[in-house]
Amino acid sequence: MSQLIEEERLFEDLCYASYLRIGFEQVKENKGKPGIDGVSIQDFEFRLEEELSRLQQELLNWTYKPSPVRRVEIPKPGGQGVRLLGIPTLRDRVVQTAVKLLLEPLFEPYFSLHSYGFRPGRSPHDAVQAAQNIVNSGKPYVVDIDLSKFFDRIHHDRLIARMGQRIIDKRILRLVGLMLRSGVMIEGVVVRSEAGTMQGGPLSPLLSNIVLDELDKELEKRGLEFCRFADDCNIFVKSQKAAERVMETVSQFIEGKLKLKVNRDKSQVARSEGVKFLGFTVVNGTIAIARKALQNAMDKVKTLTPRGTHMDIEISLKTINQWYVGWSNYFSLSNYPAQLHKIEAHIRRRLRSRLVDQQKSKKYLCQKLVKRGVSRRLTARTVYSNRKRWALSKTVAVERAYPNAWFKQKGQAIRSDKKEAHWFDVSKWVYLT
């Protein structure tokens, strides 16, 4: 980065009540839970003028001191450990948001066109489509670089120095430094932050882009085509040999220059169909949902349809729909509606299995199926076949008793409309195996 921002009064701009007020409005819009002080959005808003005035005076007098963040563990999809988030207090979120609003317009014009994460007007879909275009241009090999604990390893001094190449007002840099070193509250004990920026704060995404912009510039200097979304970076080349060479030299740059760590076990060189990028993969020039993302969806359906409790089908579908509509909206970029159909079919099978399980005995199950229009002969042959409930859920008798149309009538969200050219593709990448 070069060309200093010719603005020496950024800090005064930050301290305007209007900036802090806009910061609060964005915090309110994003919702979120209280930090270590327990103050909620409603509590803060009740005395908004007093709180904003106090923040303004503390900033101007340099008595403002960010509180430690509250650490929260969020389970990763598929049960692969947890992701650590840091929840700042409401007042700290207001200040961080105001700083973000102030700095984002100054850094945005200089960020790479190949960077898509947490940027205005850019989305994961934009990144995936850009990756598709690069693969289709004749670069089917992917260097998939996984950064180990990226947010935890951000080097504070390097980050501040990087920001200082653009910002004249050192007071802003000092304030950001205070935020970075505010610490984390873990079981009542404050642990000071020597490195990293905890995920969960409004400012963290911008800071992460400032750090990784240095990687972007290096890749551009080398003439490499890539797509980066936060710390998820894919580099595209023409051959396996070139990919292996790029993996080695770029890893050396990341670890030597940026002081970050490459996870060699998770990083890989592969053809595009073998690489997951933001939950998608590029298969034969088209976009498909990655197998891992499909399996995670299957696992989610299982958690939403637990055994051992009485099930009201309409309530269960409402709960499932709340998740599935959002999930399917994100994955609507896939050129394979059959993938959505697969998840919808799995939802129905899980619910059929639960409906079977709710009958206390084979006798009651027979009565239920006959009542729902299944012949007595088929019912008896099915129920007394010694199949377990999961196997029964796939039988003709149970599917006749609870057909697809019945679930749709009860409110199941159907998003797999047959309107894409790849509906009949039976590639191993499209269906779960």
Where are the predicted features?
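Duplex nucleic acid-engaging cores and interfaces of nucleic-acid transaction enzymes
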Residues: 90-98, 132, 160
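A conserved non-catalytic segment of reverse transcriptases
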Residues: 181, 252-327
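Phosphate/adenylate-binding "loop-and-lid" substructures adjacent to NTP/NAD/dNTP-binding pockets
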Residues: 38-77, 82
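Non-catalytic, polymerase-adjacent accessory regions of viral genome-replication enzymes
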Residues: 1-49, 53
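Conserved polymerase palm-domain catalytic core
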Residues: 58-73, 110-274
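Extended C-terminal regions of large enzymes
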Residues: 355-433
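Non-catalytic, peripheral interaction segments enriched in hydrophobic/basic residues
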Residues: 316-362, 369-370
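Core structural elements
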Residues: 15-18, 66-72, 76-78, 180, ...
